[in-house]
Amino acid sequence: MYPYLRTLKTIVYARFRTSLHFGDTGMINLRAGFSDIDHYGEINNGRQLTLMDLGRYDLGVRGGLMKVIAEKKWGFAVGGSSIRYRRRITLWKKFQLHSEVIGHDGRWFYFLQKMCLGDTICSSALIKAGVVSKTGLVPAAEVMKEFPDNTWTGELPDWVKAWIEAESQRPWPSSSTK
């Protein structure tokens, strides 16, 4: 089940936290609960990606993007992800979710997110997400026009460019069910 209450709590709390700008890192504290864990007693791999939504909501609210999205009747959609898991987060453990927009390619924004137990990074994800309208993906330049005081360039690190290139080489599955 989607964590609707956590999402609402994250959005409300974000309104009272320090503002962020593109390129800043946001951090929220979470605790692994019963609805997060699998039969191994750790946060399920899919749940980690779901919880990372909360970090992007926190960034969006604190950076003003969610306000722009609401005003323009836009939306926000994930277009791809790559995640690495290194350490378990078990039931009742407090952990931190760090989230940062690290760049854009003109169409998509790329987020680096990591879940940590103290100084130990447990998982790290690269998330490709875009702002969407009724007519499709909104170009990053159009989104950035809404933040005229921002000096962030959005230049992607080389490793993200390599990931984008690798993804472009991956064939899309055929529609056949065979």
What are the roles of these predicted feature ranges?
Residues 1-16, 85, 89-96, 100-178:
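HotDog/MaoC-like acyl-thioester-processing domains
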Residues 15-23:
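Short, motif-level signal for alpha-helix interfacial/capping segments enriched in acidic residues
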Residues 23-33:
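Short amphipathic
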Residues 36-38:
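Acidic, divalent-cation-chelating loop motifs in proteins
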Residues 47-74:
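Active-site helix/loop of acyl-thioester processing domains in fatty-acid/polyketide metabolism
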Residues 69-91:
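Small beta-barrel nucleic-acid-binding modules, principally OB-folds
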